[in-house]
Amino acid sequence: MKELIQLIAGYEQAKAKGQAMALATVVQVDGSAYRRPGARMLVTQEGRLTGAISGGCLEGDALRKAQTVIFQQKPMLVTYDTTDEDDQKFGIGLGCNGIIHLLIEPIDLNQADHPIELIRQALANRELALLVTIFSLKTAQSEQVGTIYLRQGNQEFGSFQKIPSDYRAAIAQEVNSFEESKNRIHCYPELGELSVFFELIPPPVRILLFGAGNDALPVAQLAEILGHELHLIDGRKALANLTRFPSASKIIKGPADEVVEQLETDLHTVALLMTHNFDYELRVLEELTTRMLPYIGILGPKRKTDKLIHRLEEKGIRVFRDALYAPI
């Protein structure tokens, strides 16, 4: 997720400078490779790279091909066969044993729904999005279709107008019934040679970090490295600030009764209770039991969590333990 955010930032910088760009996307991997389908790299006409498509082995060659795509303004499919023992042709030994198919698309700034804009839209709302990219291995030398459609909730962006009508119906049906929890590639042999990469783009994980003590500092740093969205919550104003937690996108300060009214949660939100304040966490946990969170981590010994649950049950509040992880 962090890589997609960096990709958009790199795009904005290049756009501000009026630079032409191309987007390289790993669309299919057969065998072993450093990156899986969905890995991306943005290339500018000046050769600036944002993101990565391998462990550093393919970037040089992909850069040269991307600049060709920028010049020709036509999508290109490139295949790297790292099962070939003569992998020195890519510059260094790859250390892989797979075949990587890379789609390189020009970014047309005059087009409202080009691939980067579709990705931007996917990240604009905290809702799972489905991105559709179409390519053909059988006609790899021909111009490719590319990333053309995004579905997020009831909203649609882009279209299937670039592909034959018989494909449109089949892919639309697939989109409407897509319920899988992971990416997949679908071929339609009865229709022809096209392959479709269905890619799920979830919103970044939001971490509600309760506690601004010194032990919360490395947790915040890890959240930033992983590209998570951090909300810091604490009653101690001297500790809960941007100087100590510069990566926090939101800081909520105040008594427990006040902060619980300001919590923003969804199915992609997790909570970490690290305040070292039993009464504070008791009130917080009381509120969190009413939210559909997949993970609530509680710092401290198991007996502390048992005591918290016991206090809540005495108040007639039922606590579902499936989402509780204690010790954290």
Residue spans of the language-model regions?
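ADP-ribose/adenylate-binding Rossmann-like module
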Residues: 233, 270, 275-281, 286-311
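Short, well-ordered secondary-structure micro-motifs
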Residues: 242-245, 262-264, 282-285, 309-310
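Segments forming oxygen-rich coordination pockets for charged ligands
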Residues: 1-235, 239-252, 266-270, 312
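Extended, composition-driven regions rather than compact fold-specific motifs
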Residues: 243, 317-318
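Short amphipathic alpha-helix with an adjacent loop that forms part of the alpha/beta core around
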Residues: 256-267
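A general structural signal for well-ordered alpha-helical segments in protein cores
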Residues: 63, 116, 281, 305-308, ...
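Active-site capping/gating segments
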Residues: 301, 318-328
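Short, structured coil segments at secondary-structure junctions
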Residues: 246-248, 291-292, 320
